[in-house]
Amino acid sequence: MRAFKVTRDTNETKIHLELNIDGTGKYAITTGIAFFDHVLSSFAKHGAFDLKLDVLGDLEIDDHHTVEDVGIVLGKAFENMEKKNIKRFGWAIIPMDEAKASVSVDIGGRPYVVGDYTPSTEKIGNFSTENVVHFFESFSNNAKINLHFEVTGENEHHKVEALFKAFGVAMDMATQIDERKGIVSTKGVI
């Protein structure tokens, strides 16, 4: 079983995360940001990852530190994963009503994000939409994965939710075990 626990305790956030990559999509998520809980739940459900996440953040300031640090901790959990025999690459195109999101990932040890997301509103509930790209940058830098995404649509809720669902599906695909593969790199290491 590929299960990991990661904690982060700073002056800005206190986070405890438990991730089972070989899960069934069970989740218990409390960040203090209702919409962020919602899209992280969608990530876990559609990625078939069991995810438990308890966060106490400095939300009296704003949601930036909480969103950033969740990306860091979730990224570290995936970075801890054994890379031997994984498929390495994953992708998904997910519609949600008028919105469509595409995500492709490479778990190749090279962090890089290319994202096309322009929010039309500043907030969804108490979640700042400017933090969407920053979440993925924080995740990618700590998971050491290459991540590309694009989002189109009109409704901001639909756009961000479709993006997190596509992220879950792409990560599920990339983390699947294929015994034929060994280390999926001509270098011999990831």
UniProtKB/Swiss-Prot annotation:
Q: Which residues cross the membrane?
A: none
In Gene Ontology terms, what is one molecular function of this protein?
imidazoleglycerol-phosphate dehydratase activity
Q: Which GO terms describe its biological process?
A: L-histidine biosynthetic process
Matching CDD domains: IGPD (cd07914)
GO cellular component annotations of the record: cytoplasm
Broad enzyme group: lyase
Q: Which cysteines are joined by disulfide bonds?
A: none
Q: Which family does it belong to?
A: Belongs to the imidazoleglycerol-phosphate dehydratase family.
Q: What is this protein called?
A: Imidazoleglycerol-phosphate dehydratase
**Which gene carries the instructions for this protein?**
hisB
